[in-house]
Amino acid sequence: MVKVVATNKKAYTDYEILETYEAGIVLTGTEVKSLRNGSVNFKDSFCRFKNGELYLLNLHIPPYSHGGVYNHDPERPRKLLLHKRELKRLMGKVQEEGVTIVPLKIYFNDRGIAKVEIAVARGKKKYDKREAIKKREMERKIREYMKYSR
């Protein structure tokens, strides 16, 4: 049973999702406990390559309430764990103009291990967002009309 801790809803509105990957994440003990409490903030978080490794930046995991002196830095860069071939493929995709890697959700898998779903994404323009909203509204109105016309 997968337990989703948090979803990055803003990523779905601001980006066009091209491809998704599941990645492990290197966390300290207090970060895991804080995640199990369900507290995490995706605001402005993104992924970058550094020395051939992928890091998740600006992900805010607040300090654990019972952590004491050994608590973690809430904004520290966190290393993502992927297979070498996946890292090479991602590195190639990021070289393209306007393409970035964003986190979509954090969850605990069946074995209780924290995972991050990341996506290769392209930023949407303002008019693309408006079109998506119009399309969603029209579909909603059509469903509503069909529901009441029976």
Swiss-Prot record:
Keywords: Cytoplasm, RNA-binding
InterPro entries to which the protein is assigned, alphabetical: SmpB, SsrA-bd_prot, SsrA-bd_prot_CS
Purpose of the protein: Required for rescue of stalled ribosomes mediated by trans-translation. Binds to transfer-messenger RNA (tmRNA), required for stable association of tmRNA with ribosomes. tmRNA and SmpB together mimic tRNA shape, replacing the anticodon stem-loop with SmpB. tmRNA is encoded by the ssrA gene; the 2 termini fold to resemble tRNA(Ala) and it encodes a 'tag peptide', a short internal open reading frame. During trans-translation Ala-aminoacylated tmRNA acts like a tRNA, entering the A-site of stalled ribosomes, displacing the stalled mRNA.
Entry GO terms, CC: cytosol
GO biological process, any: trans-translation
Organism this protein belongs to: Thermotoga maritima (strain ATCC 43589 / DSM 3109 / JCM 10099 / NBRC 100826 / MSB8)
Family according to the record: Belongs to the SmpB family.
Organism superkingdom: Bacteria
Chief place of localization: cytoplasm
Keyword flag Plastid: no
Gene3D superfamilies: 2.40.280.10
Protein's UniProt name: SsrA-binding protein
GO molecular function, one term: RNA binding
UniProt keyword Repeat, yes or no: no
Subcellular location, record wording: Cytoplasm
Pfam families: SmpB
CDD domains named in the record: SmpB
